[in-house]
């Protein structure tokens, strides 16, 4: 697999398997977390940030769907509300949209309508800029951000976990692409260690960029259980591994490619997130909660329609990194196989998806 920061991005464009057309679930997650963002803006104003001429915010891992537009609109709306309540001067809002270099910034900015940004004569003038690069390192000058938002991005890792091959060069997570019930303990330990390292790097970079008392609102894909091999946190990757294994058995994929591939993502528990933040010591935890949503739109009666929708959603965020390992030419067959395996499981109750909302304040001093 190539370097993660070169191959990790959502499916580009606006076609039927693009992220832009298959982000309904993450939109639902974002809407559930929107009160936390609204409260963060309220908190900033309570700390006299309304005295500033401009509020600077960043949406990290913004991708190219409509979610980031909702973030901008929410921040702007809350600023306008506080301006009217506090009779403060006209404010300016600077928003930086960040993602890795492979992100579809063209589709992103093409969708940035005047309805989102508004005009420069309103109570809050809004200016938007793109910032390509990895949020695991520094992106902005010191003490330049008042508010940081990130949704469904921080659980991605900078690389596949280290130490997943034996001294003899044998794969320790053979036949799997993520933590599973059959994975040896070293696999779980390696994933947690990599997440700890990467999330700590993220916090360290933001601690230098966020002003004292500034806020961060982070939404992560997570889990309720303390065991990362429970189906709630490995369901998607388990089905993908089964689909890949079937293509291996048909001679369409080299077995070694499966055995040496481990997804660079980790869905943490609330306790793990809390522990890392407290160990870092740069931020206080204002709010931490987990909530569950159905993985599929259960109001759709036809299981094939439901399965197809879920498969397209999964393909939208997994295909670039999966195709880099297994080849672009096999993707249609792989996700068709994934859909068939998924539909055969739809008779049973599927695990709900857990999301984590984490609100942090930069410690003064």
From Swiss-Prot:
Classification via SUPFAM superfamilies: S-adenosyl-L-methionine-dependent methyltransferases
Binding residues annotated for S-adenosyl-L-homocysteine, in chain numbering: 19, 62, 67, 99-100, 134-135
Domain of life of the native organism: Eukaryota
Keyword annotations: Magnesium, Metal-binding, Methyltransferase, Transferase
One GO MF term: methyltransferase activity
Note on cofactor: Binds 1 Mg(2+) ion per subunit.
Annotated catalysed reactions: 1,7-dimethylxanthine + S-adenosyl-L-methionine = caffeine + S-adenosyl-L-homocysteine + H(+); theobromine + S-adenosyl-L-methionine = caffeine + S-adenosyl-L-homocysteine + H(+); 7-methylxanthine + S-adenosyl-L-methionine = theobromine + S-adenosyl-L-homocysteine + H(+)
UniProt binding sites for Mg(2+): 173, 259, 261-262
Cofactors, names only: Mg(2+)
Binding site for caffeine: 26, 152, 155-156, 221, 317
Pathway(s) of this molecule: Alkaloid biosynthesis
Protein's GO biological process: methylation
Residues at the site labelled Involved in substrate discrimination: 149, 221, 265, 313, 328
EC number(s) per entry: 2.1.1.159
pH dependence (record): Optimum pH is 8.0-8.5.
Entry similarity comment: Belongs to the methyltransferase superfamily. Type-7 methyltransferase family.
Task of the protein: Involved in the biosynthesis of caffeine. Catalyzes the conversion of 7-methylxanthine (7mX) to theobromine, to some extent, able to convert paraxanthine to caffeine and, slightly, mediates the conversion of theobromine to caffeine.
Protein name: 7-methylxanthine methyltransferase ICS1
Organism encoding this protein: Camellia irrawadiensis (Burmese tea)
Lineage, opening ranks: Eukaryota, Viridiplantae, Streptophyta, Embryophyta, Tracheophyta
Gene that produces this protein: ICS1
């Amino acid at each position: 697999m190539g370097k993660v920061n070169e191959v990790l991005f959502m499916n580009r464009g606006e076609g039927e398997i693009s992220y832009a057309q298959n982000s309904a679930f993450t939109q639902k997650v974002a809407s559930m977390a929107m009160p936390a963002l609204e409260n963060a803006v309220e908190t900033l104003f309570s700390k006299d940030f309304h005295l500033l001429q401009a509020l600077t915010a960043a949406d990290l891992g913004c991708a190219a769907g409509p979610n980031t537009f909702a973030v901008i609109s929410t921040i702007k709306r809350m600023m306008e509300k506080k301006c009217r309540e506090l009779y403060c001067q006209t404010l300016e809002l600077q928003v930086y949209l960040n993602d890795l270099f492979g992100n579809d910034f063209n589709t992103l900015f093409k969708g940035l309508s005047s309805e989102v940004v508004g005009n420069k004569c309103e109570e809050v003038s809004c200016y938007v800029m793109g910032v390509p690069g990895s949020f695991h390192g520094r992106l902005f000058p010191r003490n330049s951000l008042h508010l940081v938002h990130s949704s469904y991005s921080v659980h991605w890792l900078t690389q596949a976990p280290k130490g997943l091959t034996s001294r003899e060069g044998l794969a320790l997570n053979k036949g799997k692409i993520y933590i599973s019930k059959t994975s040896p303990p070293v696999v779980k330990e390696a994933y947690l260690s990599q997440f700890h390292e990467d999330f700590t790097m993220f916090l360290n970079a933001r601690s230098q960029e966020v002003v004292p008392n500034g806020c961060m609102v982070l939404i992560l894909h997570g889990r309720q259980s303390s065991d990362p091999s429970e189906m709630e946190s490995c369901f998607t990757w388990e089905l993908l591994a089964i689909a890949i294994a079937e293509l291996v058995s048909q001679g369409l994929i080299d077995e070694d490619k499966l055995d040496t591939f481990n997804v660079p993502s980790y869905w943490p528990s609330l306790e793990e997130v809390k522990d890392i933040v407290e160990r870092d010591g740069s931020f206080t935890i204002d709010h931490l909660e987990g909530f569950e949503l159905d993985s599929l739109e259960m109001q759709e009666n036809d299981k094939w329609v439901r399965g197809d929708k879920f498969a397209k959603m999964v393909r939208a965020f997994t295909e670039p990194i999966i195709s880099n390992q297994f080849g672009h030419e096999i993707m249609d067959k792989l996700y068709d196989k994934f859909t068939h395996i998924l539909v055969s499981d739809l008779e049973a109750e599927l695990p709900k998806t857990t999301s984590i909302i984490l609100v942090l304040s930069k410690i003064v001093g």
